[in-house]
Regions:
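Short, conserved active-site loops that position catalytic residues or coordinate cofactors/metal ions
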Residues: 38-40
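Short hydrophobic/aromatic beta-strand micro-patches
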Residues: 43-45
Length: 97
């Protein structure tokens, strides 16, 4: 099970690799109640230089680097006012490139 520090470090590296602006870590890793069965939940803020198709490679690289499941979204995929969006704004931990 990766530590939160390892998760944040890997996300930072991937943000730089894919030229994305920043990300939000949310879910159990953000709350600090992750278990060996937990996946990693991330929303990427791609920005102007991030190709929308890079989200798939970003997700796969995150899964491979940390040897665990990960759910990765680009912020444009998340509708405001939904439970997912509300969860992001409430518990999300911002990770800067």
């Amino acid at each position: 099970m990766p530590t939160r520090l390892a998760v944040e470090k890997t996300i930072k590296e991937l943000l730089a690799r894919y030229n994305a602006e920043d990300a939000l870590l949310f879910g159990s890793y953000a709350r600090g109640d992750e278990t060996p069965e937990s996946d990693i939940d991330v929303v990427v803020f791609g920005g102007d230089h991030f190709k929308k198709t890079d989200i798939f490679a970003f997700a796969e690289d995150l899964r491979e680097a940390l040897a665990t499941n990960a759910d990765v979204f680009e912020i444009s995929e998340v509708d405001k006012g939904t439970p997912l969006y509300d969860s992001l704004m409430k518990e999300g931990i911002k990770i800067f490139r």
